[in-house]
Structure formats: C-alpha cells, structure tokens
C-alpha cells in the first residue's frame, strides 16, 4: 500500500471494503463512452458483483453508449451520493472494460441482476458487464478531500 497525505492507493485483486460497501449501497451509475471524438453518458441501473469486481447492467444494442462501446471497450463512470453537506460527500469514479458476458459469467450476472431488479424479467434487453480496472473514491467523512484509490494489476488480465 502507498500512502500520502490525501490519497490511499491500493493495488490488489479487489477493492477495500469501504469502496465495495459504497458501491453496493447504490443502484444507479453514470457510464461514459466515446467513439471518434464523440463522448456520451448514460445512467444505468446496476448490480455490483464484488467477488468479480464488476458492474452488471442491461441495455439495448441500439443505444448510443452500447453502439460506442462496440467500437471502444474502454469506459469510465461514476456513482455519487447526492448531498448538500460537504462533510458527507461520497462518490466513486471508475474505469473499466465493457463486454457481454458469456456462458457461466452470463448466467451469474443475469441471476444477480434479476435478483436486484426482478422487473427486468419483463423486458427484452441485454446483459452487459464492466470489469473494473481503476477506482477513485472520495469520502469526506474520512476528512475533507480524502481519496481511496484502487487499481487492478493489468498484468492479471493478460
């Protein structure tokens, strides 16, 4: 672990519990995509699978963010706690790689998503996952501007 005055940086297979707990307590993320110098953001209902460190969400093929992701799999996003109290500000910014899960991963992701959002059973949509590679969490409850940073060892992906 690397420490400095405002940042705590961790490089391991999974983020620390405070980050996982924050992500797990929420259900809407903003997903940012881009292609040919055209950025886009989309709000997505998600479920987080901490054991795989990935977000699961549904979206149709014809949406702008999925169209862009089909050309550029590198995405970013955020999850934020809305509050006007500066001392309670919390949020996560992340980077990751988007894909359609296959086989066992698909079944696991679908089961997790439908458990959290059973109404999705009524919709004709597609499951997507974002394999998280970087997280920066701001948590002012730990001190103003306190950041917790996690990075995936990219060598593990190869």
Range-by-range predicted roles:
Residues 59-63, 76-81, 107-119:
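Short acidic (Asp/Glu) patches
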Residues 2-28, 155-158:
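Extreme N-terminal tail/first-helix region
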Residues 23-24, 70-71, 114:
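Alpha-helix boundary recognition
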Residues 24, 39, 120-123:
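Short solvent-exposed loop/turn micro-motifs enriched in small/polar/acidic residues
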């Amino acid at each position: 672990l690397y420490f400095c005055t405002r940042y705590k940086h961790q490089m391991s297979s999974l983020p620390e519990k405070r980050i996982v707990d924050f992500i797990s307590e929420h259900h809407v993320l903003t997903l940012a995509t881009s292609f040919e110098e055209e950025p886009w953001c989309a709000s997505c209902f998600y479920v987080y699978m901490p054991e795989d460190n990935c977000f699961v969400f549904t979206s149709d093929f014809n949406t702008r963010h999925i169209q862009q992701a089909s050309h550029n799999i590198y995405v970013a996003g955020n999850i934020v706690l809305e509050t006007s109290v500066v001392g309670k500000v919390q949020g996560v910014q992340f980077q990751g790689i988007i894909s359609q899960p296959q086989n066992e991963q698909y079944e696991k992701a679908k089961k997790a998503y439908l458990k959290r959002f059973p109404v999705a059973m009524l919709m004709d949509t597609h499951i997507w996952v974002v394999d998280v590679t970087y997280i920066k969490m701001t948590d002012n409850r730990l001190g103003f501007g306190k950041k917790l940073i996690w990075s995936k060892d990219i060598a593990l992906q190869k």
